[in-house]
Every structure is written in structure tokens, then in C-alpha cells.
Amino acid sequence: MVGREDEMEKLLDLLIEGDPRLATISIVGEEGLGKTTLAAEAYNSVYVKNYFDCRAWVHVSSKSTEEELLDAIRKSVVQFAETIGSIYEHLTGRKFLIVFDNASETYLPGKVKGAFPDDVNGSRLLLTTTAKWMAHEAQPSLPLALSALNIEQSWEMLVNMVFEQNNCPVELKDLGISLVKKCHGFPLAILLLGSLLSKKGKKKLCVVKSGNISSRI
């Protein structure tokens, strides 16, 4: 991930290294900073796939109930399971990773933590959230806080999206940097900007007006 190499390395270390007891890791930050993308990159990495025996990804909506969350976990980790005990039984003896994406409205993951055995084998729960209090409540020592990208990282991300072989024509660089500054380091905004510019094509970028683009970010 452009601009998130250090965070990715730290996240993989938290997932794979350290205390073998069951731990809850939180990726914390404002909306649009790339929490879900970072979690997904780690979740789908070769290291994580090889390390964990069982993985599951659960999206937590603002309307999720405890029962719905358990049902989503059941469908992800074991077919035909009907009780919280079934999840526990299925995961016992396995090294597992369960991701709770967008756990920002209520601390439901904490309410269902009893569904997961702690076999002291390196299993992990991973939350993405905008709520700092939730990360503290889950496990104060293991939050990974995301901040906005700096201008160099933002520009690199945009160039990778828009230009072939990551080669921006010199005459377009100043305009491109002025546009990317309007994204304030938020990867989601840069992604939208890159999508808009890619559709226009690099030959048309020179006639793009900053005001027109910024109004759509």
C-alpha cells in the first residue's frame, strides 16, 4: 500500500508476532483514511493466510445486533452451526483471525468475545473503527492509529493510479500536486480524484480545472 508500508509492517507484526494469548488489535482513524483497505491487505497477505488456520471477515453495521453478529461469524467460520458453542467448538485448537470491519457504533465485538477460545496459540481479533474509546476498551496496548498521508505519499498514490509506468509529465506535476493537496491526505479522496483523472486521460489532465475536481471530492 502506497504510504502505508510502515503501518502494514506493524500490523503484520501485531498479528503474527508477540504474545500467543488471544488478543484484540484495533485499527483506528477517521473515515476515509484506509482502515478497511489496510485490514484487507493484511487479511489477504500470504503471511496471514499461511499463519492462521481459520480466517473470517465480518462487517459490523450501525444496526447490527449481537445475534446478527454471531450469525455472520457462524456463516464465516463453520457451516450449519446454530449456537455460540458451535463457534467455540469449531475454533478450539485452531489458530484463527476474525476481522470486525467498521465496528464504530457499539462495542458488539466485546459482547461476543466469549465465542472465541483462547488456546494461547496466537489467535487474533482485529477491529477497524473510528472510535478511540472502543480501541481502548478492546485492548489498550494494541491500537494502530492511522493518520493522513503526507503530500509526498499522496502524490505517489495519485501518480500510481493515473500515469502509466508511474511517470507523470513534468508539465503536469504542479497541477497534479495542487489537486492532490485538496484531498488533505485522505486515501479515499485521492482514490476518487485518481478515478476522475484516469477517466479523463492524461492528455486531458492539463485542461482540468482545480475547482471542478475539488468540488467532486
Where are the regions a protein language model picked out?
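N-terminal flanking helix/linker immediately upstream of nucleotide/cofactor-binding cores
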Residues: 1-33, 37-46, 50, 61, ...
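Surface-exposed loops and adjacent edge beta-strands of modular extracellular domains
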Residues: 17-19, 48, 105, 187, ...
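Intrinsically disordered, low-complexity regions enriched in proline, serine, glycine
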Residues: 23-24, 37, 50-52, 67-70, ...
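A short hydrophobic beta-strand->loop->alpha-helix junction that borders the nucleotide-binding pocket
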Residues: 55-64
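Non-catalytic, charged helical/coil tracts that couple and regulate nucleotide-powered enzyme cores
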Residues: 73-81, 85, 121-123, 131-217
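A conserved switch/coupling segment of P-loop NTPase cores
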Residues: 41-51, 85-149
